[in-house]
Swiss-Prot record:
Entry keyword annotation includes Membrane: yes
EC code(s) of this entry: 7.1.1.9
Catalytically driven reaction(s): 4 Fe(II)-[cytochrome c] + O2 + 8 H(+)(in) = 4 Fe(III)-[cytochrome c] + 2 H2O + 4 H(+)(out)
Protein name: Cytochrome c oxidase subunit 3
Taxonomic lineage: Eukaryota, Fungi, Dikarya, Ascomycota, Saccharomycotina
Subcellular location field: Mitochondrion inner membrane
SUPFAM superfamilies: Cytochrome c oxidase subunit III-like
Organism from which the protein derives: Candida glabrata (strain ATCC 2001 / BCRC 20586 / JCM 3761 / NBRC 0622 / NRRL Y-65 / CBS 138) (Yeast)
Gene field: COX3
Length: 269
């Protein structure tokens, strides 16, 4: 039954989702990824092949699922105003869960830093740890990330004002700024004088900044998808929920990075 035929009989503005295999497949893929990663890190599996396979399945499943969602929103017209409100509310709850995760990591950092154990030399950073200096790559990354927040806001306002070229330009610059940030963060990790196994400092540092790093990689993918959708005229000045949620995600990660920089790189050193 086509969308026009369904609209004649549907007396409510909500989208009744058809049966889909992607939620179940993604759940099993994420379970496989978690188990394989844990077993590999603890030495029960001698290589990363299962991790790469599970990651590939997660990626492909996500691509096919997002393809269906984009088709429902763009070509079938299933995303009404009521549906868009529900999507925005759901994404806000997702952002809240992310904030709570980072709040737990900050709690762990303060718990260890404000009362360092005698095993750590009664000092923070612990004795023998050469911390990353806040005036080096972290400061550059902060400037880059704040700049990306400005450019994506510029792109959003240009889209609302129906200036497609400026919107595309701002989004293109944002993508490259995020890629540069991720690259600089990777360089910082490869040149750091400590690892995730160097006590509580290394564990909390890499857990906090590493989780943010993974979110930035995911943000880069989301921005690339938004750029492709904008180029193919799938966004209008009044209907661009995917772009709005990506912008919100970008600003939340900017704020989290500011707290990470102040606490992990500046105050903690």
């Amino acid at each position: 039954m086509t969308h026009l035929e369904r609209s004649r009989h549907q007396q409510y503005p909500y989208h009744m989702v058809l049966p889909s295999p992607w939620p179940m497949l993604l759940s099993f893929a994420l379970l496989s990824l978690t188990l394989s990663l844990g077993l590999t890190m603890h030495g029960y599996i001698g290589n990363m092949n299962l991790v790469y396979l599970a990651l590939l399945v997660v990626t492909l499943t996500s691509v096919f699922w997002f393809r269906d969602v984009i088709a429902e929103a763009t070509y079938l017209g299933d995303h009404t105003i009521a549906v868009r409100k529900g999507i925005n509310l759901g994404f806000l709850l997702f952002v809240l869960s992310e904030v709570l995760i980072f709040a737990g990591l900050f709690w762990a950092y303060f718990h260890s830093a404000m009362s360092p154990d005698i095993v750590l030399g009664a000092s923070w950073p612990p004795v023998g740890i050469q911390a990353v200096q806040p005036t080096e790559l972290p400061l550059l990354n902060t400037i880059i990330l704040l700049s990306s927040g400005a450019t994506i806001t510029y792109s959003h306002h240009a889209l609302i004002c129906r200036n497609r070229n400026k919107a595309l330009s701002g989004l293109f610059i944002t993508i490259w700024l995020i890629i540069i940030f991720v690259t600089c963060q990777y360089i910082e990790y490869t040149n750091a004088a400590f690892t995730i196994s160097d006590g509580v400092y290394g564990s909390v540092f890499y857990a906090g900044t590493g989780l943010h790093f993974l979110h930035m990689v995911m943000l880069a993918v989301m921005l690339i998808i938004c750029y492709w959708r904008m180029r193919t005229y799938q966004f209008t000045s009044t209907h661009h929920v995917g772009f709005e949620t990506t912008i919100l995600y970008c600003h939340v990660l900017d704020i989290i990075w500011l707290f990470l920089y102040i606490v992990f790189y500046w105050w903690g050193v």
